[in-house]
Amino acid sequence: MKKITILGDIMVEPPFMQQVENNGEYDFKPSFAPLKTILEESDYVIGNLETPLAGPESGYTHELVSFNSPDVLVEALVDIGIDAVSTANNHSLDRGYEGLVRTVEVLDRYGIAHTGTYPEDFDGERIHYFTVGDTKFALIAGTFNTNFGINRVDLVGKRARCVNMLHPVHSGGAIYLPLPPAFAKTLAYVEGLMGRKLVWEESTKLKRVMDMPRCSIDDIIPMESFERCWQWVCEDYAEARKNADVVLFYPHSGGQFNIEPGKYTQYMVKRAVELGFDGVFAGHAHTTQRAEYLEGKPCFYSLGNVSMSPGTFYSIPECLPEYGLAVHLHTEKQKIQKVTFSIFKMVQEEGVPMKVVPVDDLYATLEGEEKQLLQAHVSEVYTRVTGKPHTWENPQKEYDL
């Protein structure tokens, strides 16, 4: 059988960017290289590129919620065997329309296929097709958000279809769980002292100081706008079904740092399965969530991160955001015959750049309490994904869904 592997969110936050920089040069390869032991047996690898490649003149990442990575990031992705990426996510427009265009140009130059975002004059194939063995695949990707509230980049006129939107550009798509009255009172007091509203980064730091971080949840389902945006999904699916044996949906949607999928993402996944997709692989929550078979189709509500900086102040450690999934589709005779997954961890050691390490490889290097803690975390992630208690003695390279 052939093996298709799907990864989650590939990000470069400010801490990671600083770690891989040396005298103005950047080297991401050592950070991603350990993943090769998971990916070397894969025949095709897909990931979510959650950063523009807008060039140095646009300013590399220095803010937590506005990304731009050096082109050499793509060299590292090629090095570990990534064949295709989705560019449709909430950071697609962090450097505006021009950054979107340059991103796909850089990917073309390095030979990585892409889908989800397009220049305004694009007249090619919006669906990504690829063939592995005797099976032809179609990959359709989209995003529920492009951070309009932060970057204020709109998509109108000829640019209305430059991003595969699953929710209107101007909408949020997630709401925060209610905060305790004590925080609201403190926030009002601090803003009164400063004479202005706190920006997102400041209010997030205040939550952390008060030890009350909160996950977000996408429980709002605005049916009218959903149906309007869903129309392109239906059209692309119909086209893909005519031309491919296996059609995969790769949406960017969910509540950040929430270990449970929200109603919006659950509804969208259900609609995708009803439409006929052969598998759904979502991301954006920055933590792993459950997976299940719906009508016999594998559905992962969040694959988690590939390269989120451990310890980022706005993350919620309790949800284990430093662990991510690599989902493997074993295919033969034009069908998905089996689904497995691997677990890896983003490891940060003092004085060296973050590394992304498969948990079985990492386990072999640890001793004592560190070994026990890793095993406990892997067990928690496994149970969260499968709904089953673990039955293995040590962390494994792959697990059956």
What are these regions (language model features)?
Residues 1-401:
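Acidic, metal/ion-coordinating pockets
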